[in-house]
Regions:
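N-terminal secretory signal peptides that target proteins for export/translocation
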Residues: 1-9
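Bacterial N-terminal signal peptides
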Residues: 12-25
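Short, glycine-/small- and polar/acidic-enriched structural segments
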Residues: 31-168, 172-175, 191-197, 208
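Small-molecule pocket liners
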Residues: 50, 116-122, 209-210, 230-234, ...
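Pocket-lining segment of extracytoplasmic ligand-binding domains
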Residues: 96, 180-274
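Secondary-structure end/capping motifs
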Residues: 241-319
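Conserved C-terminal helix/tail region of periplasmic/extracytoplasmic solute-binding proteins
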Residues: 310-340
């Protein structure tokens, strides 16, 4: 009887080892192989693009089988051409670049919306405090914004339109350095300024301006614009994305996970993971504390917000009005990821 028990034990061990080897082979076969891609980013180390570095540092790209190289570059027609042939897999930049691309015949669209507020504050010159009490009183005011295509100018235009005013009802003042801007606010040469942190805090600390409207938080943005304001997106060439749907899905999945992480952690916890940003514009804790308010919870593009942003841009650039806004974004990849 003893030899039989020994034989049975040896057989059991053999089968166990064989089973483990088989499972290992299956696991290896199922594991995603790293796909080398290039991701273009309009500002790798800026807070509005925080999800890019965070996804990289958290290993979320790797988890989805992606070996990602980040390329620092501005959005352009040349980049769109590289998106079309796959030299670059995707571009992280402001949503309005998809409207520009579509107006020029390039089929680019956002595949995930990461930031849904401008990431600014509208500050009023302290000498006007009390004299102007609501956004409906912006008519005739002088606002320091940005260049014509900038998110700051689009924000100012959208603020006017939402109040039933025209974009010609205010005077846009070109931005300068923050010391000069502070002087303009103090000397009565400007009434308002649209600014991010840490500049907004600088104007407040200098005693020349105070926050009039919060354009960082979702709640504040809805109050000021009537909807959220899509800013940071990942966009792709749609013919390329349709030809490589798994690649698009893996990228979107990594960013959906990153948005969940941002919404579940404190500014201090997040700052500890992105020393590159902290070493730059995030030196002051309030920069990241304010910045993380910009980010969506799920990555879906709200149709009403996309249309309203297009309206604000088209008010200054009428040629963009011909763009079919439904072609500037898709929620299909995010919806697939969220169903998992």
């Amino acid at each position: 009887m003893k030899p039989r028990r020994a034989s049975t034990f040896r057989t059991f061990c053999f089968l166990a080892v064989a089973a483990m080897a088989l499972l290992a082979r299956i696991a290896i076969a199922a594991a995603p192989t790293d796909t080398k891609i290039v991701l273009a980013v309009d500002g790798v180390k800026v807070v509005r693009n925080l999800p890019v570095l965070l996804a990289d540092h958290l290993g979320y790209f790797k988890d989805d089988g992606l070996d990602v190289t980040l390329k620092e570059t501005a959005a352009s027609a040349e980049i769109d051409a590289m998106l079309a042939d796959g030299r670059i897999a995707g571009m992280v930049a402001y949503y309005h670049h998809t409207i520009v691309a579509q107006s020029e015949g390039r089929d680019c669209a956002s595949v995930i919306t990461m930031a849904v507020t401008p990431g600014y504050e509208l500050l009023i010159a302290n000498q006007l405090k009390g004299a102007v009490k609501s956004l409906s009183e912006l008519k005739g005011k002088r606002i320091i914004t940005g260049g014509p295509h900038s998110a700051k100018s689009t924000s100012a235009n959208w603020l006017m339109l939402h109040q039933g005013l025209k974009i010609t009802d205010y005077t846009a003042i070109a931005p300068k350095d923050k010391v000069s801007i502070a002087a303009s606010l103090k000397n009565g040469e400007a009434d308002f300024v649209i600014a991010p942190e840490p500049d907004a805090g600088f104007y407040a600390e200098q005693g020349v301006a105070s926050v009039f409207a919060d354009l960082y938080s979702v709640e504040g943005t809805r109050q000021s614009f009537g909807s959220v304001f899509p800013t940071t997106v990942l966009y792709m060439s749609m013919p390329y994305a349709r030809a490589h749907p798994e690649l698009a899905r893996h990228l979107v999945n990594a960013f959906v996970r990153t948005l969940s992480f941002i919404n579940a952690h404190s500014a201090a916890e997040i700052a500890a993971l992105v020393p590159e940003i902290v070493a730059g514009e995030g030196k002051e804790p309030r920069v990241i504390a304010q910045g993380i308010k910009m980010f969506a919870t799920d990555g879906l593009m709200p149709a009403d917000a996309a249309q309203q942003e297009a309206n604000a841009i088209s008010a200054l650039f009428p040629d963009y009005a011909k763009v079919e806004i439904a072609k500037t974004y898709t929620n299909e990849f995010v919806a697939t990821v969220l169903k998992k």
